[in-house]
């Protein structure tokens, strides 16, 4: 196989959660541009359909499915619908997640449960549903979007529950990689650093100078800088890579 063909994902069937906006939307469109058909799973049906429409305009098949990833029945139904509509599932990107920033001593139990349910339980339920499709195929790539927050404690924001959830995603990734390797399923994670997204631009711009000063490259990343990593992990170029956390943080965790 030539080096160019190693990175070829054209014709593969992909699914991205939380792809109505932000990082998830960028990754879903990137896969479509690389030749994948893509299912968009989102809690917000309107934004999901918007992303799916953009993908269809690029000449690829895309469906939008409204789903609460913390509900097993909804997840299983959405994945079954995806496999039927696209003709299988080769790449699953578990991107959906939330962050709540409050001092740990003041964090309500309901907020802890909400973040853990979406960021960790949701990733597990979606990975489980993906594996049930991929095991009979004897192939597949699951890519979990973790965070550098699962490796290093962020400052100055206080977000113990978010950090904990993302550390859990990284370990879940390793555990599933070992369990499912015999079935030809690879499971890896991507841990972004500070990113300029719709969410951070809307409410966290006052923190940008601090974040930039703590990042060796001196700037925040943009979601588009994650596209290459996802195509790599979804392609045959990463055929011997599983259980790995790919950190893309401008050098933050290398300090």
Features from the language model and the residues they span:
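Alpha-helical segment proximal to the catalytic Tyr-Lys
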Residues: 132, 178-182, 239
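Short, small/polar-rich loop/turn modules that mediate ligand/substrate recognition or access, typified
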Residues: 88, 181, 186, 241-243
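Short C-terminal tail/terminal secondary-structure segment
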Residues: 2-7, 231, 242-255
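Residue(s) in the substrate-gating loop at a strand-loop-helix junction
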Residues: 147
């Amino acid at each position: 196989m030539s080096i160019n063909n190693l990175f070829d994902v054209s014709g593969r069937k992909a699914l991205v959660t939380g792809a109505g906006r932000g990082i998830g939307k960028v990754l879903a469109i990137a896969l479509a541009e690389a030749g994948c058909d893509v299912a968009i799973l989102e809690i917000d049906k309107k934004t999901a359909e918007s992303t799916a429409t953009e993908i269809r305009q690029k000449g690829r098949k895309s469906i939008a499915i409204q789903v609460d990833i913390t509900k097993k029945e909804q997840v299983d139904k959405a994945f079954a619908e995806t496999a039927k509509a696209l003709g299988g599932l080769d790449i699953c990107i578990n991107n959906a997640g939330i962050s709540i920033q409050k001092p740990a001593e003041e964090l309500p139990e309901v907020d802890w449960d909400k973040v853990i349910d979406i960021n960790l339980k949701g990733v597990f339920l979606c990975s489980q549903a993906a594996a049930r499709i991929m095991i009979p195929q004897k192939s597949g790539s699951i890519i979990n979007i973790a965070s550098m927050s699962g490796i290093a404690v962020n400052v100055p924001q206080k977000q113990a529950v978010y950090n904990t959830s993302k550390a859990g995603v990284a370990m879940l990734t390793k555990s599933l990689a070992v369990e499912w390797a015999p079935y030809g399923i690879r499971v890896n994670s991507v841990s972004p650093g500070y990113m300029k997204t719709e969410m951070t631009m809307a409410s966290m711009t006052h923190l940008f100078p601090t974040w930039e000063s703590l990042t060796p490259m001196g700037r925040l990343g943009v979601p588009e800088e994650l596209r290459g990593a996802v195509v790599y992990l979804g392609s045959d170029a990463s055929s011997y890579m599983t259980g790995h956390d790919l950190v893309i943080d401008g050098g933050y965790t290398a300090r």
